[in-house]
């Protein structure tokens, strides 16, 4: 497998360090060669495109220039970073008037981490190296609303009903539960300004997941993980309900299946303690 650049984005340096630790474990155990993109910068996330259209393209655009200089495809763990890099790619490639300061050739691929790790050959490598079964886990797969939309930008084929996470976890033995809210919005950054809105959106996700028989939720987006994990106790109090639905990154599920020994290093960062579920499933 050729070496690829990883664009970690800001959150993997802070609030989503558990995501980074689990993905680094997975890539190491699968012999996937990742090298952090040198001198990367913030993509602008939700702030830049609400303030300055040019800045919203040039911030991620600079990272694409760096990636082309490195000559390696780019893997992006963060759903929003991936979206912004794809937007920048599209805008810069059609910028014939020289509106933006950066130029790219489109010579490197930009891949969402989930897409990258759910390739058939990579999944087969996981299955070949699997140490622990996930048969007692019944997750719903929650993709969120950003990574696949708009499809004209992301190139997603099944943007309303993605299945790559479902198939990956099924190959590792998990009893994946189908549900209709795979790509519904969790409220994202509105958790600060409109917690009532986020609470209502996330409550709907909890209730449907439980009604479908799930015992956990698996995500590929840091913002989704934060809203579903960080606020679960508060949402329960707000609606007078007692929820227990551990929320995992899909990379944590892979790491568990591969028999990672330092799982406590990242699982301890969860607000909803996954230990009772993992203990009962023989995974701790």
Where do the language-model regions lie?
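Iron-sulfur cluster-binding electron-transfer modules in prokaryotic oxidoreductases
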Residues: 1-284
């Amino acid at each position: 497998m050729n070496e690829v650049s990883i664009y970690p984005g800001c959150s993997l340096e802070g609030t989503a360090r558990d995501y980074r630790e689990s993905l680094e474990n997975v890539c190491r155990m699968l012999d996937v060669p990742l090298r952090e993109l040198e001198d990367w910068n913030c993509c602008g996330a939700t702030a830049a495109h609400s303030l300055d259209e040019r800045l919203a393209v040039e911030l991620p655009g600079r990272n694409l220039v760096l990636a082309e200089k490195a000559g390696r495809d780019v893997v992006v763990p963060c759903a929003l970073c991936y979206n912004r890099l794809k937007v920048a790619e599209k805008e810069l490639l059609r910028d014939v008037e020289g509106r933006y300061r950066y130029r790219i050739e489109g010579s490197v691929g930009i891949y969402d981490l989930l897409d990258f790790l759910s390739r058939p050959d990579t999944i087969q490598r996981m299955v070949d190296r699997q140490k622990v079964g996930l048969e007692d886990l019944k997750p719903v797969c929650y993709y969120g609303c950003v990574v696949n939309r708009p499809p004209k930008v992301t190139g997603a084929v099944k943007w309303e009903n993605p299945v790559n996470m479902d198939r990956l976890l099924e190959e590792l033995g998990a009893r994946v539960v189908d549900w209709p809210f795979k790509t519904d919005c969790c409220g994202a950054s509105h958790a600060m300004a409109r917690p009532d809105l986020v609470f209502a959106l996330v409550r709907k996700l909890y209730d449907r997941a439980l009604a479908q028989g799930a015992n956990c939720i698996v995500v590929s987006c840091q913002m989704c993980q934060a809203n579903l994990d960080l606020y679960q106790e508060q949402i329960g109090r707000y609606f007078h309900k007692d929820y227990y639905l551990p929320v995992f990154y899909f990379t944590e599920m892979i790491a568990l299946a591969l028999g990672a020994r330092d799982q406590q290093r990242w699982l301890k960062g969860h607000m909803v303690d996954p230990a009772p579920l993992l203990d009962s499933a023989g995974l701790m």
